[in-house]
Design a protein with these regions (language model features):
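Conserved aromatic/hydrophobic "specificity hotspots" at molecular recognition or selectivity sites
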Residues: 178-218, 266, 276, 473-476
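Alpha-helical transmembrane segments
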Residues: 98, 219-224
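Alpha-helical transmembrane segments and their membrane-interface exit regions
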Residues: 190-194, 251-257
Length: 476
């Protein structure tokens, strides 16, 4: 999965400090930490059938095992970026890493649904504190051409994380067992925790920015949790069920209240007015759809290959490798197209490819060969969409707003994964809980329709032509 950066810190006026001689070691260490966070999005998918069998968990609970992490990672990411400014980036990284390690240990020791989902929530909280602070550190540690190179390495961790995640998940589940997909974070996290103060400077906190929009963070997280609850419930009770409709309606109300709160507070978590700008709105839309589709496909594929075909977790992980590589290939090709054509056409082409890949599986037959082929085609398209979304949103942004725009886009990135898994879990419910394939066909057909509709929306919504770079002050 292509994974873009959560936020960028504001630029500071004044003469830059001399290069830190430890900067490349710091990048390597922070890269390991960020890779660990990205791994935990995809590493779980391959292990879900084993987790369900061992702990006696049903479809709905297994869906929450995936979504709880991305929900809190995305819902609290902007708050994490704000706290990094208030408390200092290194302090927040250490706190976030400590929480993540403890939550990983709890997840690995889980003996039931409550402890496992609670551990995943804790992992999401730790990731939301660690990731934006780590990126802020990378951005302030490097300057000029070195900064561009460092941020390129950071962005590349996304695709690598997806590929390593599915392989590692399969290998650990087939070897020492599914609990080790969580336990592996403990020694790695502790090593980073001990080493980090030795290679990363203690950045200054900003005492003049003590206000933190905690209500905003809680509102957007609660709204998305309510939406996911409604979507997951639909798989058992139906889309017209009272509980389903009530949960979705409550989510809509909470999102509206969030918008009101963000306009009223002095230091908002998200400047809602950014979403009135066509580039930022376009980027947020693309990241929401692309991440939802990709993580949903990992979820569907894992259950199909293991439960319906009887494949081992290791073989499933290996079969997902072309899908993960396809995402990276699509991102590489997409970056060249975006440079030449702008974001609109590559996004539309990418979404059309995603629709074609999922439609291939839905229309012909759900077989292992077609499954992997279709998902690989879809992943190439979605890789291009990730690049289009990020570049469209950030290229025209003024320097002082690039961090805000990046934070908005990447919040939609993480929340898209949570919503996508919830949707396909309900659509494919008959196949996830029984021997029939009709649920998989329904889910893949729906994803193909989503791809087509999203491609049409992209053509209408994204600015035409090559993307303009910011070249002067913006007047409001």
């Amino acid at each position: 999965m292509a994974h873009s950066s959560p936020a960028s810190p504001p630029s500071h006026v004044g003469r830059p400090e001399p290069p830190d001689p430890r900067r490349w070691r710091a990048l390597a260490l922070l890269g390991v930490a960020q890779l660990m966070l990205i791994l935990d999005v995809t590493v779980v998918n391959v292990a879900l059938p084993d987790i369900g069998a061992d702990l006696g968990l049903g479809r709905a609970t297994l869906t929450w095992v995936v979504t709880a992490y991305t929900l809190f990672f995305g819902g609290l990411m902007l708050l994490g970026g704000r706290l990094a400014d208030v408390l200092g980036a290194r302090r927040l990284m250490l706190a976030g890493l400590g929480i993540f390690v403890l939550a990983s240990l709890a997840s690995g020791l889980a003996n039931g649904a409550a402890m496992l989902v609670g551990g995943r929530v804790g992992q999401g909280l730790g990731a939301a504190l660690l990731s934006p602070a780590a990126l802020a550190t990378v951005t302030t540690t490097f300057h000029g051409a070195e900064r561009t190179k460092a941020l390129g390495v950071w962005a590349a961790l996304g695709g690598a994380g997806s590929a390593i995640g599915v392989l590692l998940g399969g290998a650990l589940t087939a070897g020492p067992g599914w609990r080790w997909i969580f336990f592996i974070n403990v020694p790695v996290g502790l090593a980073v925790l001990v080493t980090l103060p030795l290679v990363v400077r203690a950045g200054a906190a900003h005492p003049g920015t003590r206000r933190v929009d905690l209500p905003g963070a809680l509102l957007v997280t609660a709204a998305t949790a309510s939406l996911i609850y409604g979507l997951v419930n639909a798989g058992d009770a139906g889309w017209g069920d009272t509980v389903t409709l009530t949960a979705v309606a409550a989510a809509a109300v909470l999102y509206a209240v969030f918008g009101v709160v963000e306009r009223a507070v002095r230091t908002p978590l998200m400047r809602v007015r950014l979403l009135t700008r066509r580039p930022v709105l376009s980027g947020a839309f693309l990241m929401l759809v692309a991440t939802g589709m990709l993580i949903g496909l990992f979820f569907l594929g894992s259950f199909y290959l293991q439960r319906h075909q009887g494949y081992s977790a290791l073989l499933t992980g290996l079969l997902f490798l072309p899908v993960a590589v396809g995402t990276g290939l699509g991102a590489h090709l997409g970056s060249h197209l975006v440079d030449r054509l702008g974001g609109r056409l590559p996004a539309a082409i990418g979404l059309t490819l995603a629709a074609a890949g999922t439609g291939l599986v839905a229309l012909l037959a759900v077989t292992p060969t077609l499954m992997v082929t279709g998902l690989t085609v879809a992943s190439i398209g979605l890789g291009a969409v990730f690049v289009s979304g990020t570049t469209t949103a950030l290229a025209p942004a003024a320097p002082e707003e690039s961090g805000l725009a990046s934070g908005v886009v990447n919040t939609f990135h993480e929340l898209g994964g949570a919503v996508g898994v919830a949707v396909v879990s309900s659509l494919a419910a008959p196949s996830l809980t029984g021997p029939v394939l009709t649920g998989f066909t329904t889910a893949f057909t729906s994803w193909a329709v989503v791809g087509v509709v999203a491609a049409l929306v992209a053509l209408a919504l994204l600015p035409p032509g090559r993307l303009p770079a910011f070249d002067g002050p913006r007047v409001h």
